[in-house]
């Protein structure tokens, strides 16, 4: 039987004012439910950077890492975190914001399918959003680069109708901006 582990590692010190201010700003900006969601994203970015350092150390020791390095970079490029011509050193520059930008919740707002992060979260949790033909109900789902164009409303959802009040408000705002 496998033992489940935590997906996150909390801060080393609980009451650092500067960190608390940054965390609060990020939680508001990305519409996170609690600090655990932020810590999970931080842990993901930290593990990617640690693996890049590990590969750099192996390469410096003279070991062949070309295959391992290529697999790792391909994975991050498919996730859309790195550009197509990125190198291993670019992984060291990744931050928690890079991970948070790939969340489904964030992508909905960036694509204009939801007005706010909270609304995007509600649409996802209530099962109104489909990615690549499958309903996804996890706001923390990391969207791959190839799936960006395949984010849409579920066809049988009331929100699929362009006349739905939640969608009409978006269209009204667009027409007001165009006429101004």
Curated annotation (Swiss-Prot):
It comes from the Archaea. Residues 164-174 have a biased composition (Basic and acidic residues). SUPFAM superfamilies: Alpha-L RNA-binding motif. The gene is rps4. This is Small ribosomal subunit protein uS4. GO terms for cellular component: small ribosomal subunit. The keyword Protein biosynthesis does not apply. Residues 102-174 form the S4 RNA-binding domain. Part of the 30S ribosomal subunit. Contacts protein S5. The interaction surface between S4 and S5 is involved in control of translational fidelity. One of the primary rRNA binding proteins, it binds directly to 16S rRNA where it nucleates assembly of the body of the 30S subunit. With S5 and S12 plays an important role in translational accuracy. InterPro entries: Ribosomal_uS4, Ribosomal_uS4_arc, Ribosomal_uS4_CS, Ribosomal_uS4_euk/arc, Ribosomal_uS4_N, S4_RNA-bd, S4_RNA-bd_sf. Keywords: Ribonucleoprotein, Ribosomal protein, RNA-binding, rRNA-binding.
């Amino acid at each position: 039987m496998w033992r489940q582990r935590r997906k996150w590692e909390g801060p080393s010190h609980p009451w650092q004012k500067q960190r608390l201010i940054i965390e609060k700003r990020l939680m508001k900006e990305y519409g996170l439910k609690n600090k655990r969601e932020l810590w999970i994203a931080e842990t993901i970015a930290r593990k990617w950077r640690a693996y890049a350092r590990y590969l750099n150390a192996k390469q410096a020791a003279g070991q062949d890492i070309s295959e391992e390095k290529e697999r790792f970079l391909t994975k991050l490029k498919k996730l859309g975190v790195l550009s197509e011509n990125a190198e291993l050193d670019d992984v060291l520059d990744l931050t928690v914001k890079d991970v948070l930008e790939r969340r489904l919740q964030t992508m909905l707002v960036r694509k204009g399918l939801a007005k706010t992060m909270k609304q995007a979260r509600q649409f996802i949790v209530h099962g109104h959003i489909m990615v690549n033909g499958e309903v996804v109900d996890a706001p923390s789902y990391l969207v791959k680069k190839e799936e960006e164009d395949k984010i849409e409303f579920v066809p049988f959802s009331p929100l699929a109708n362009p006349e739905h009040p939640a969608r009409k408000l978006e269209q009204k705002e667009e027409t007001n901006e165009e006429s101004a």
